[in-house]
């Protein structure tokens, strides 16, 4: 069901109105407390600027870290407010707590176009319990609700789901709208051939996605540490590579399901091996049928890269989730980098390339190719759940278009 978006509200609807905007400002900090990557803050700017331009009073709600329902001084949103002020070119006032007298006073003093950032909503235990009393107090600070936090949309919390019961309209922000358009679109109405590239170390964390994608895709390419569970299930020796023994039957079932559906399921034909898990480990390339004892696979091999590139060449939509190897180690980053480069190339020829959150995003950014992708998702768990076909509570709660 399509959701109503911020684009449907004009200045007449918003001028002078207090708009509660749930944003995803869960950014990484270094030991000195400085923000090391402000991507998520910048991703919310189109929505914030639109509201400011329409004369709304913008009240931002966000979580940061996992303070477990109590105040944690290291998890205050102070550095976020400072960075947001720089990006907007205007003062962003931060409250001492997300509800209560200070928040009420600062929101009450707002002029049209002002921006207030409420303190970390997870300092209140009731946030993650989706407590309706807390949701009502948050909602009392506003007249309209906008959810632009796709990365938190798979959680039914007070600030993502509960507040919608008290605020109308409740609409999707521009970032949320773009995420749904690309990810939902890729699953529901893709241009074909549709391929999914699934990587990462564990089959267990990607089971739901693999099952759902085998149902929907024409091709599924698998890389990362999880390939060794598939090889072992085929009866191959995998040395000391990572294997999930309790998922061997599942690996067989997934291969059988793909075959029965006529889906091309590709596993690497060769791998880059290491004698230990380290950036400077000794390495060698081996066919997957000839992995020696005492060695572990840390990347897909050069032959596998060529096979994967050939499989992707004619695709019109590609979803990528999870690296091909341990790309944090330069020696074992070739497979992941090759996929990033290939997606940039086919994207230039009209293929829709979607990077589905998590480590793939870091890989594409490390390769300097982020700008060449059609869409880079800001959600990790949320993207996976959407691709699995699950209903996201934070999306379901919004007004229908």
From Swiss-Prot:
SUPFAM superfamilies: Phosphoglycerate kinase. Pathway: Carbohydrate degradation; glycolysis; pyruvate from D-glyceraldehyde 3-phosphate: step 2/5. It comes from the Bacteria. Pfam families: PGK. The keyword Magnesium does not apply. GO terms for biological process: gluconeogenesis; glycolytic process. Gene3D superfamilies: Phosphoglycerate kinase, N-terminal domain (3.40.50.1260). Its EC number is 2.7.2.3. Keywords: ATP-binding, Cytoplasm, Glycolysis, Kinase, Nucleotide-binding, Transferase. InterPro entries: Phosphoglycerate_kinase, Phosphoglycerate_kinase_CS, Phosphoglycerate_kinase_N, Phosphoglycerate_kinase_sf. It is found in: Cytoplasm. ATP binds at residues 206, 297, 328, 357-360. PROSITE patterns: PGLYCERATE_KINASE. One of its GO terms (cellular component) is cytosol. Monomer. Belongs to the phosphoglycerate kinase family. This is Phosphoglycerate kinase. It comes from Synechococcus sp. (strain CC9902).
